Regions:
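Basic/polar, acidic-poor N-terminal "presequence/leader" segments
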Residues: 1-15
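Core of compact, soluble alpha-helical bundle domains
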Residues: 15, 19-26, 30
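Alpha-helix N-cap and coil->helix boundary residues
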Residues: 30, 34, 78, 97-101, ...
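Helix-hairpin-helix/helix-loop-helix acidic hairpins
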Residues: 32-65, 69-71, 121
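Mid-chain, well-packed structural core segment of small domains
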Residues: 65-99
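Short, conserved aromatic-histidine micro-motifs
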Residues: 93-111
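A structural-propensity feature for long, helix-poor, extended segments
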Residues: 107-123
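Conserved small/polar residues in nucleotide/adenosyl-binding loops
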Residues: 126-128
């Protein structure tokens, strides 16, 4: 696997702000450190894990990190879904789940009903 295309801070903030503008919610960043932590998880995993994680595991790291770290005042789950889909798109894949399935899955992530590994399995076995 060649080095994936990563999501940077400016891009994820722009997508978050767009979600707030289009769908409502409390704007703003609650903790930039938590956001940076969530954004660095997949890249760190890629560089320091042996064997290297696959694209589904890396996308899951974005989704899980953003949903669980809760770095924004609002729209963390929406932003987590966008991050997974964007990462997959940037790297030649698509998230082919229905809107309802994506919603239910990210709710389960935020509620700690599924693990990061289970999220990666959901992505790889069913939806990319």
């Amino acid at each position: 696997m060649t080095e994936p295309i990563w999501i940077n801070l400016r891009v994820i903030k722009a997508f978050h702000d767009r979600q707030i503008n289009e769908h409502g919610g409390l704007p703003g960043l609650r903790d930039e450190g938590l956001l940076l932590s969530a954004l660095s998880r997949p890249e760190n995993s890629y560089h320091y894990s042996d064997p290297k994680p696959d694209v589904a595991e890396l996308a899951a790291a974005y989704g899980f990190g953003l949903a669980k770290n809760h770095p924004f005042n609002d729209a963390n789950k929406r932003t987590a879904l966008i991050a997974m889909r964007l990462f997959l798109k940037l790297n030649g894949y698509d998230l082919a789940a229905s809107p309802e399935d994506k919603y239910k899955t990210i709710i389960r992530v935020a509620a700690s009903d599924i693990s990061e590994d289970e999220l990666a399995q959901w992505l790889s076995l069913i939806h990319i």
